[in-house]
Amino acid sequence: MATLDAIREALPEPARDIKLNLQAVLQPGTLTPAQRWGVAVATAAAARNERLLAAVLADARAEVEPAVVEDALAAAAVMAMNNVYYRFRHMVGKASYAEKPARLRMNRLVKPAASKVDFELFALAVSAVNGCETCVRSHEQVVVAGGLSEDQVHEAVRIAAVLHAAAVSLELAGYAAVPSAAAAAG
């Protein structure tokens, strides 16, 4: 994980916990390499930090097939749309909106390049990052029905949380070095 090692080293001191967690969550566990790296790619894309995404993509491409990376990126793209749409319907809470057809194309959900269950796991992780309760519940039901355990779901969401925190922490790097007003006046 040479590229993510550089990301970890770039994290400022206030993000020390994130630095340690970033190393830990991508170690082998209950997820397959395709699941682990797919979740990492999808959630790094959802976090919208180019530097983090480039690092995760470089490491993922060394570990998994191109179809996994394509599916992870597709999950991030489709969920960027779906999470907004379904979160709106959920938040408004009106039956009239729930009855309206979405009329949004989401063919990749039905026919991913690699594993259907893995794609759903990537979508679940992105939905957790994006805060769409409806999508989280839906994708969690699909992956559990597809044979994944709650431990695997939990591991995926841990990866999502840490990747999101890493993206935020990279943004902090410039601010951590700026002296406070009190120190500057000192």
From Swiss-Prot:
Disulfide bonds join 132-135. Its EC number is 1.11.1.28. It holds the Pfam family CMD. One of its GO terms (molecular function) is hydroperoxide reductase activity. It is an enzyme of class 1 (oxidoreductase). One of its GO terms (biological process) is response to oxidative stress. It catalyses: N(6)-[(R)-dihydrolipoyl]-L-lysyl-[lipoyl-carrier protein] + a hydroperoxide = N(6)-[(R)-lipoyl]-L-lysyl-[lipoyl-carrier protein] + an alcohol + H2O. The active site is at residues 132, 135. The keyword Oxidoreductase applies. Keywords: Antioxidant, Disulfide bond, Oxidoreductase, Peroxidase, Redox-active center. Belongs to the AhpD family. Antioxidant protein with alkyl hydroperoxidase activity. Required for the reduction of the AhpC active site cysteine residues and for the regeneration of the AhpC enzyme activity. PANTHER family: ALKYL HYDROPEROXIDE REDUCTASE AHPD. This is Alkyl hydroperoxide reductase AhpD. It comes from Anaeromyxobacter sp. (strain K). The gene is ahpD.
